[in-house]
Amino acid sequence: MANRSGIYYWKCDRPDAFFAIRGQADNLELDNEIHDMVSTFFGEDVSVRKACGQGNHLTFLADHDGRTFFIRVENGSDGDDYMEVEASVLSSVKAIGIPAPEIFAVDSSRSKWPFAYQIMENMPYEDLNKLLRGGALDLQDIMFKLGAYVARWQELEFDGFGPFNTEKLRRHGLLEGLHKTYREYYFLNMAKHLDYLKKKPFLTK
């Protein structure tokens, strides 16, 4: 598995950022494996359907015992193992009163299934982008609330900087940044990113 020690920004620095959503829409073998994984978790056969989400992961919905669950799957070629970190972060912010979905299962080890996954609480609401385009969002109210949440989660303090260390989390249950200083993280891929912008050319001399 790959950690994120060489990553500054995921979509820029990941070797194959869109593997999971490119050419995977009709992968019957993968669909069957995901069905088996979800059914194993619930202890009985469960119907699983595509959620058609937008982003870097494959998404599914599963119904069990009168509830709908949201499934995220990461099967990229670089073996990213960050879903457990994401689950831990959600748990941490939820513990200080910030609304966050509950994670019922997470595993990015790929020891039993050939993908990382989360089984989480489903939020049965419209996509925010769709609501925004339809003029149905009170932006001033929402931005005020989001600002309050951001201020609150600043109460959480961790050692290190940059992406969290997944091995540290697995072995010791601690969230710790992969880099010792902010400078080390900030300049990690600066030269590569600037070179890319010059070649496009987005930046000129």
Please place each PLM-identified region on the residue numbering.
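Short, P/G- and charge-enriched loop/turn segments at secondary-structure junctions
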Residues: 47-49, 205
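Solvent-exposed, charged/polar functional surfaces in cytosolic regulatory/catalytic domains
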Residues: 37, 152, 192, 196
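Active-site catalytic-loop/activation-segment of kinase and kinase-like phosphoryl-transfer enzymes
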Residues: 165-205
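Juxta-kinase regulatory segment immediately upstream of eukaryotic protein kinase catalytic domains
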Residues: 2-46
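ATP-binding pocket architecture of kinase catalytic cores
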Residues: 49-169, 173
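Helix-rich C-terminal or lid/interface subdomains of diverse kinases
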Residues: 4-11, 140-144, 184-188, 192, ...
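Charge-dense, low-complexity intrinsically disordered segments
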Residues: 21-28, 32, 77-80, 133-140, ...
